[in-house]
Amino acid sequence: MAGFGLPNFGQLTEAFRKAQQIQQNAQKLQEELDAMEIEGSSPDGRASIWLSGNQQPLRVRLEPSLLAEGQDASETAILAALQSAYEHSTTTMKEQMEELTGGLNLNLPGMSD
């Protein structure tokens, strides 16, 4: 009986089933993002930074020629590489979350533009 504006039991059961599936998929996605290595590089390619899909720093590579140019050049290149890696990582995370939610428009914190 679906009186008094309450959903019927079948709809409620289906909603819970979908919620459980999303939760399982979210756990799998978390593991996949943790395992990813996403590279960002400075425009000249002499500085590279790798982040996980969850923006955890993993590695840094600096070419000796960059270090020879001094602190300012090194800092500028490192910042550019970090910004590039962060942009790639957040884009990847957003795309993966959109796949997970299947366009449910959940409006998750930190996932909006």
UniProtKB/Swiss-Prot annotation:
Alphabetical list of NCBIfam families matching this protein: DNA_YbaB_EbfC
Residue pairs linked by disulfide bridges in the UniProt entry: none
Protein name as catalogued: Nucleoid-associated protein P9303_00241
Known partners and oligomeric status: Homodimer.
Matching Gene3D superfamilies: Nucleoid-associated protein YbaB-like domain (3.30.1310.10)
Keywords: Cytoplasm, DNA-binding
Family as reported in the entry's similarity comment: Belongs to the YbaB/EbfC family.
Organism of derivation: Prochlorococcus marinus (strain MIT 9303)
Pfam families: YbaB_DNA_bd (PF02575)
Subcellular location: Cytoplasm, Nucleoid
GO molecular function, one term: DNA binding
Main location, first listed in the record: cytoplasm
Reported function: Binds to DNA and alters its conformation. May be involved in regulation of gene expression, nucleoid organization and DNA protection.
